[in-house]
Amino acid sequence: MSLREWLIAIGTLVIIGIVIDGVRRMRRARKESMAISSGMGADELKDSPLDDDFNPELPNGGARTVSRSTLEDRGYLKRDMSAPVSTDQEDDVTPESGWSARDDDEDDGILSPPRVVKPETEESEPVEPEAVKTPATEVDRSKTRPSVPEKAKAEPEPRAEEPPVVTTEVEEDTARRTPNKPRKNQPLAGANRPEAREVLVINVLARSGEQFQGSKLKSLFEACGLEQGDMDIYHRHESEDTTTPVQFSVANAVEPGTFRPQDMAGLSTPGISFFMSLPGPTNALQAFEFMLETAQCVVRNLGGELKDERRSVMTPQTIEHCRQRIREFERKQRSQRA
């Protein structure tokens, strides 16, 4: 065979290989899209097997993400005997890379760029000067001088804990609130939640082999306007007044799911669960954005990954689907009142 015939044969094989690989990728993408789409349906929340399986990503398999049925079993949500409101159609979702601590520099256009709260300038550690060669005469003199004990050497002061970096809208909303305002005859935070007909869940799971520390979680929650209250979990109200509607709540992903104040200093957990129940907030879409920003704030400051209510990666498409569920719920609420 001539060189030309060899080149034609090789080119034909390369083209066939590219076509076969393209068909294989299309089939795999279609299967994954159907699996994710079927996994986000609101109609199947009651049948979620989420709490029956261990999460292999977490140490000892002890942490499980939280579904609506799990929240109801723990008593965080009141059961509603009426049929849950769900969307009639679900959009196909193309799998993309999820939100994680590595995604801080990327902007998907979903939220405004975060405002970084600059921590106080840390004291730089003292730099020891390089050793200088001295003449023999000076060395002899130094032998007669009393040696300085090592403990007397200057030691760097321990670094102060850096304040958490809070995203823009949550920071501004929390800053508008009156700190340490005295409360009289106000209910416990989260005690006024109505019966939930729709629940949106965002899980934040630590990376394999790592844990979230209770003291850091407490500081971050308080910086984001959350308050420890009913059911020994954290809640965020629309204002510092606990009679206002609850925007969202945060529970421990490990049984029994609580954040008791006396245990926060020594607490460590591989995951936490944010959940927002509908009806509830006056502005449900804004409450969801605050919940999402707070979850992303945990990822930014403490590491970890965002997961949805079925332990799947929280993609931009998943977040947009949650917003669509809120819009559909509000639309059906308006049609029922009409």
UniProtKB/Swiss-Prot annotation:
Coiled coil: none
SUPFAM superfamilies the record matches: Cell-division protein ZipA, C-terminal domain (SSF64383)
Subcellular location: Cell inner membrane
GO cellular component: cell division site; plasma membrane
Signal sequence segment: none
Protein topology in the membrane: Single-pass type I membrane protein
Annotated source species: Marinobacter nauticus (strain ATCC 700491 / DSM 11845 / VT8) (Marinobacter aquaeolei)
Protein name in UniProt: Cell division protein ZipA
